[in-house]
Amino acid sequence: MFDQTTHTEVHPLTVGKIETASGAIKPQLLRDAVKRAVTNFFAQMDGQEAEEVYEMVLSEVEAPLLDIIMQHTRGNQTRAANMLGINRGTLRKKLKKYGMN
């Protein structure tokens, strides 16, 4: 995202929203969706102890995120890594982890 006033690059989340062609998406919407999903997950556990919830939630969010970003960049790993704010080597490891290489 480019700030026209200061002529500098600004990370979208620093201004509290993500800009899209159709307008702004507030990160709070994503947070709320994850919160609902995790709440539903625990409700379905029926008193059983859950294990490795952190890793499960991260992978359930990360895999579709990577898939969408790779589609958006038409497989360009350099662009995808830049969009995600990670280096290309890290992206390649994550793609391999989810069988997307």
UniProtKB/Swiss-Prot annotation:
Pfam family, one: HTH_8
Molecular function via GO: DNA-binding transcription factor activity; sequence-specific DNA binding
InterPro entries registered for this protein in UniProt: Fis_DNA-bd, Homeodomain-like_sf, HTH_Fis, Trans_regulatory_Fis
Keywords: Activator, DNA-binding, Transcription, Transcription regulation
Gene3D superfamilies membership: Homeodomain-like (1.10.10.60)
Disulfide bonds: none
Residues annotated to bind DNA: 77-96
Highest taxon of the lineage: Bacteria
HAMAP family given in the database record: DNA_binding_Fis
Oligomeric and partner information: Homodimer.
Role: Activates ribosomal RNA transcription. Plays a direct role in upstream activation of rRNA promoters.
Family, similarity comment: Belongs to the transcriptional regulatory Fis family.
Protein name in the entry: DNA-binding protein Fis
Native organism: Shewanella pealeana (strain ATCC 700345 / ANG-SQ1)
Lineage, highest ranks first: Bacteria, Pseudomonadati, Pseudomonadota, Gammaproteobacteria, Alteromonadales
